[in-house]
């Protein structure tokens, strides 16, 4: 949800082919003035909380939308957990500057970002929010339930052996 979630499917394919990753950056810059904080309530098995956020992602990847890269030891592909990332809405221009600088260098410890490892989550909003599902339009929803089905897919190397542990 949130800032830049529509960039992946709004960027014309011809522009993507021509400019690659830069096409997404240019489309994102074009939309920067439309960014609005979103009120979200997040429920996980461990806790429930709410707040105003610019972005919420649920992934199991070392890269989120090509704008942020996690350290390899922060993400495991077979631990049964998603990485739930919440970027809080900055209160002022100083916080916005700090957030922008931290995102540029992939600082996971920025005070405006929460990274949770969750097996499932319910995310609700008073208004329907646009979802991106693997880079495609996922529709608009007020309530979304996500659950990690641990071990549902077995990954096999070219030598035919299953990978027991992937980081």
Regions found by a protein language model. Give the residues of each.
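Long C-terminal subdomains/extensions of small-metabolite kinases
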Residues: 1-167
């Amino acid at each position: 949800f949130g800032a830049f979630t529509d960039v992946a499917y709004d960027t014309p394919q011809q522009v993507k082919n021509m400019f690659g990753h830069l096409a997404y950056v240019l489309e994102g810059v074009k939309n920067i003035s439309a960014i609005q904080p979103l009120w979200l309530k997040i429920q996980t098995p461990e806790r429930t909380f709410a707040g105003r956020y610019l972005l919420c992602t649920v992934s199991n990847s070392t890269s989120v939308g090509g704008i942020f890269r996690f350290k390899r030891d922060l993400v495991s592909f077979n631990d049964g957990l998603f990485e739930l990332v919440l970027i809080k809405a900055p209160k002022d221009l100083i916080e916005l500057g700090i957030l922008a600088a931290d995102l540029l260098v992939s600082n996971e410890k920025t005070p405006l970002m929460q990274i949770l490892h969750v097996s499932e989550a319910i995310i609700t909003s008073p208004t329907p929010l646009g979802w991106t599902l693997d880079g495609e339009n996922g529709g608009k929803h007020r309530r979304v339930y996500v659950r990690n089905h641990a071990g549902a897919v077995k990954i096999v190397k070219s030598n035919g052996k299953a990978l027991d542990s992937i980081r």
